[in-house]
Amino acid sequence: MADGSKQTHKNPSTAQLVEFALARGEGELTANGALVAKTGERTGRSPNDRFIVKEASSENDIDWGSVNKPFAMDAFNALWDRVATYLADKETFVSELEVGADPEHYQPIEVKTETAWHQLFARNLFIVPEQFNVANKPVWQIMNAPGFECDPARDGTNSDATVIINFADRKVLLAGLKYAGEMKKSMFSVQNFLLPAKGVLPMHCSANVGSEGDTTLFFGLSGTGKTTLSADPKRFLIGDDEHGWAPGGVFNIEGGCYAKCIDLSQKNEPVIWDAIRFGTVLENVTLDEQRIPDYSNTELTENSRAAYPLEHIAQRKEENRGAEPNAVVFLTCDVSGVLPPVSKLSKEQAAYHFLSGYTAKVGSTEMGSTSAIQSTFSTCFGAPFFPRPAGVYAELLMKRIESFGSQVYLVNTGWTGGPHGVGKRFDIPTTRAIVDAIVSGELKDVETVHIDKLNLDVPVAVTGVDAKLLNPVNTWADKAEYDKYAQQLAEEFAANFTKYDVSDAIKQAGPKA
């Protein structure tokens, strides 16, 4: 286990890491066998502390700005050495893992952590290969030292913590951060940069496969139903969050899941519930006196999480990959009540809505009032993780859709009949019926009606769905009011889209403001 006096534990097992974490006071064992750890004041990602080293090999391909902030190479090297020195006389944990379940497109990574629980997280979320780095590729190094405190004046960081990606030297530095999700998302960002150069589209989506081998992808921001709808008892899960679409197939970038735990129940989410057992890391979950997790307690954060390997899910695709997708679903939660429950998209419309990444959220005050409603646009349904200009990903999406003939659908899991507070939300059985119709191929050649203002084509009939729900104008009592809200939404789409430098065919595929 140990090599040398520094006590570096190489490729430790799950049981060993749980033992180390408990012995070192890093966490507690729960009644269901999971390890619970707390991350202190940072209970989510710290986007202001994330940087990319600006260097010749990658700088012309990165979309620099508030998401991808530059960091000087010499400052990075100095900080890397400082953190390495800090870890040199400490007990550390190292694993040889991989990112990307594809023999051609994987990246080998060596993950070094100061704590046992972060190492367990890495082994749960990344891929533990049977044989490491078969193709003998250059290895990425991830160094994670949550106990190290950065000094902005000395180190050039934004605060006492940082995440820095260095493409030239294949290094990722995480210092001063306990929130483990930063590790997962930093390697997602790395693959999001590397894969497009090989003609592979990286995606922030979930994916599942039917018994006939047909793949469906679900894109969507938090709270739109990505995890719920992909956990389908009739289908096999590939993954819940990060995938690559290459000519010939879809592969998971990860080897595990990082599920939200807020209000988790056995009845509503049995797949996640059953996956939480020995080996799982629970992050910022509160326990009662009997060590039973209280998933409804949001004292620490609403962003409590469970990190577990895919092996904890019975109904999964063991190879961690599948065929190219027959169906691609963009999930949006429209709080204005304007969008139809399902629309069929052309490849240009697909690129438009992929770039827009529209969903909406309600402000915390005066829930029923329209002033509390905010629309949110997150490029490619995951703006914080895409280093290249957005158009690169949109063009790749169109290419993949066209070459395979995938059908793309926009599915609204939000409101109808009026905005939030007036209309009502589509219930889960309605959305599930729509997804079933998409997956079965029922909607591929269905008759549609065009909604001019939204520039969308809507099926006239879907099995198991009330026909009058399909065209949103029919669910509003006041048609003029619907038109007003539709105009407002179309204007928001248009205003958001001005930032994209893409072909006219894509620009004209959106709502007509």
Curated annotation (Swiss-Prot):
Q: Which organism is it from?
A: Shewanella loihica (strain ATCC BAA-1088 / PV-4)
User: EC?
Assistant: 4.1.1.49
Tell me, how does this one assemble?
Monomer.
Q: What is the lineage of its organism?
A: Bacteria, Pseudomonadati, Pseudomonadota, Gammaproteobacteria, Alteromonadales
Protein known as: Phosphoenolpyruvate carboxykinase (ATP)
GO molecular function annotations of the record:
ATP binding; metal ion binding; phosphoenolpyruvate carboxykinase (ATP) activity
Cited Gene3D superfamilies = 3.90.228.20, Phosphoenolpyruvate Carboxykinase, domain 1, Phosphoenolpyruvate Carboxykinase, domain 2
Cofactor(s) for this UniProt protein? Mn(2+)
Q: Which GO terms describe its cellular component?
A: cytosol
